[in-house]
Amino acid sequence: GLFDIIKNIVSTL
């Protein structure tokens, strides 16, 4: 979902 995308960006950091 949308949160998955946010968590994906945070994981990149």
From Swiss-Prot:
Sorted UniProt keywords: Amphibian defense peptide, Antibiotic, Antimicrobial, Secreted
One Gene Ontology CC term in the entry: extracellular region
A GO BP entry: defense response to Gram-positive bacterium
Signal peptide region: none
Record carries keyword Secreted: yes
Tissue-specific expression: Expressed by the skin dorsal glands.
Cellular location(s): Secreted
Name assigned to this protein: Dahlein-1.1
Lineage, broadest ranks: Eukaryota, Metazoa, Chordata, Craniata, Vertebrata
